[in-house]
Regions:
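Short gly/ser-rich loop at a beta-strand->alpha-helix junction or flexible surface loop bordering the NTP-binding
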Residues: 1-162, 301-305, 314-326
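Surface segments flanking catalytic/ligand-binding clefts of nucleic-acid enzymes
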Residues: 115, 119, 130-326
Length: 326
């Protein structure tokens, strides 16, 4: 891959954007890490200028003729250029077991030629999530890029660097490992404080619940990892939220499996709320669901002040977006 010219007017910059790796895989705008203050912005190339030392392991070499920023350093460079809410979303994705990735037709064709029908198979590292009709989607399953412990450790190491305050503030909001954008959106609406537009509830993601004998007979599972576990302040009341995304839960088989798991958890005494995107994105419907959840938690649902309502509206504008275009 050719080097990036420093000058914004250098015609080689546009030719770089036509390179197959950029055009069909990385996409534009192309974000590059650079030193020096010249040419930070361009039509299809965005330079993230970083002068001075970088945290150890910030840059990794690849077999494609270019170096890339590590996931943690990528988040740090983003911290000073995106809202804290968007940074939280990026952290959830990198610490989670999913990715949203649009595959260009040329890349898909190359994958099909190399791997056949197995191009989206989990055995190749990333597993493509198919919709109810069996068609590929932009949602993928993959191992986490960042461990939660590494996120916290990195936040402690970067104090004083540009973007560190925003990074640390966002890292404190990550409640666990999630498996889809819907789980991220739900976790942020439930978990962020009312001063940030959320509901300020205590929650954890995908915590292990060991099934009782009766629950195992119903579900056929030894353990379950519910999407969201909500609890009241003293932990005496709990409520489970299962996010029902169309891509994962749309098929008949998935619905039957979800029903078995839900019944098994209810048999163990857990209230279970099945949350859809429609219920989450519609503020009035979300309020009704919140009333149900708070009744399970034996907590009053306090009305939001006009200021808190405005903060929730802004939060919703930040999180309900085209995730692939973020």
């Amino acid at each position: 891959m050719p080097d990036l010219p420093d000058s914004v007017d250098d015609p080689r910059r546009e030719r770089l954007c036509e390179h197959p790796l950029v055009k069909h895989f990385l996409g534009t705008p192309l974000h590059v890490l650079a030193q020096g203050g010249c040419g930070r912005k361009g039509g299809r190339i965005v330079r993230h200028v970083w002068n001075g030392g970088r945290p150890f392991g910030s840059v990794r070499q690849t077999e494609f003729g270019l170096d890339v920023a590590s996931p943690l350093f990528t988040l740090l460079t983003l911290a000073s250029s995106v809202s804290n809410e968007r940074l939280i979303m990026c952290m959830y994705e990198m610490c989670g077991t999913f990715a949203v990735c649009k595959i260009a037709p040329q890349v898909k064709l190359a994958l099909e030629q190399a791997c056949g029908s197995r191009w989206g198979d989990a055995r190749l590292g990333w597993e493509n999530v198919r919709d109810a009709s069996g068609n590929p989607t932009d949602l993928w399953k993959r191992p986490p890029l960042i461990e939660l412990s590494d996120l916290t450790e990195f936040a402690n190491k970067i104090q004083g660097l540009r973007g560190a305050k925003s990074f640390t503030r966002a890292a404190k909001c990550i409640t666990g490992i999630v498996a889809s954008p819907l789980e991220v959106q739900a976790s942020m609406l439930f978990g962020l404080s009312r001063l940030r537009g959320g509901e300020g509830l205590r929650l954890t993601n995908n915590v292990e619940i060991r099934m009782t004998r009766s629950a195992r007979l119903i579900s056929g599972l030894d353990r379950r990892y519910p999407d969201i576990l909500l609890s009241n302040k003293d932990g005496s009341r709990e409520c489970l939220v299962e996010c029902q995304g169309k891509a994962i839960h749309g098929s008949i088989e998935s619905k039957i499996s979800d029903s078995d798991r839900t019944t098994a958890l209810q048999a163990m005494g857990y209230p279970v709320v099945l949350m859809t995107y429609g219920q989450l994105v519609d503020s009035d419907a979300f309020r009704v669901v919140m009333e149900l959840i708070m009744s399970y938690l034996d907590m009053p649902l306090k009305d939001k002040t006009p200021r808190q309502q405005e903060l929730e509206r802004r939060l919703r504008e930040e999180i309900f977006i085209d995730w692939a275009g973020m």
